[in-house]
Design a protein with these regions (language model features):
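Hydrophobic helical h-region of N-terminal Sec-dependent signal peptides
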Residues: 9-13
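N-terminal signal peptide c-region/cleavage motif recognized by signal peptidases
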Residues: 16-18
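Mature extracellular/passenger domains of Gram-negative fimbrial/pilin and adhesin proteins
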Residues: 2-6, 20-181
Length: 181
């Protein structure tokens, strides 16, 4: 009888383990590459900051939700003449990182410290004018093929209304990463 009780105990304790049986293996492979191209003429260092000054716009230019205004070019040049580490034929692309200034909708929140405008965010745009929503797959599609050891990633940045806009300052930032494939 004791053996039967022990067998029942072992079976009872081992049955939940069957629910956690291994069904397969996920293998992850990747590649970490050396940053081989300069960014706007400066060696990559994590501090390759780019400043974009948006023009002043009237609140009347942003009177409906979703209206955009003040589109301003954002150009990031990778490589340069004679930079053999920035290989011709590779494709440069940029990823805008989902950081503390990114709204749930994928725009850049206004973080102006003094007299901020309200109901306005900053939006990034691809070279074809389509809007980018940071963190949403398929919305950031600008790429540039390196030729002559250089390429330029062309984007634009502008204001976007999220409600009835009030006048004031606009300031924000976003982190970015470049890749070359």
């Amino acid at each position: 009888m004791q053996n039967l009780s022990k067998l029942a105990l072992v079976m009872a304790l081992s049955s939940p383990l069957a629910a956690f049986a291994v069904d397969g293996t996920i293998t992850v492979d990747g590649l970490v590459t050396a940053q081989s191209c300069t960014i706007n003429g400066v060696a990559p260092s994590g501090a390759n900051n780019v400043a974009v000054k948006l023009p002043a716009v009237s609140i009347s230019a942003l009177k409906t939700v979703g209206a955009t205004a003040g589109l301003t070019p954002l150009r990031i040049k990778v490589g340069g003449a004679g930079e053999t580490g920035c290989a011709d034929g590779k494709v440069a692309s940029i990823a805008f990182e989902h950081g503390p200034n990114v709204t749930a909708d994928g725009y850049l929140a206004n973080k102006a410290a003094t007299s901020p405008a309200t109901n306005v965010v900053v939006q990034l745009f691809n070279d074809d004018g389509t809007g980018i929503k940071i963190g949403e797959a398929g919305t950031n599609n600008t790429k540039a093929t390196i030729s002559g050891n250089t390429a330029t990633l062309e984007h634009s940045v502008g204001y976007r209304a999220t409600g009835t806009v009030t006048a004031g300052a606009v300031s924000t930032s976003v982190m970015y990463s470049l890749s070359y494939n």
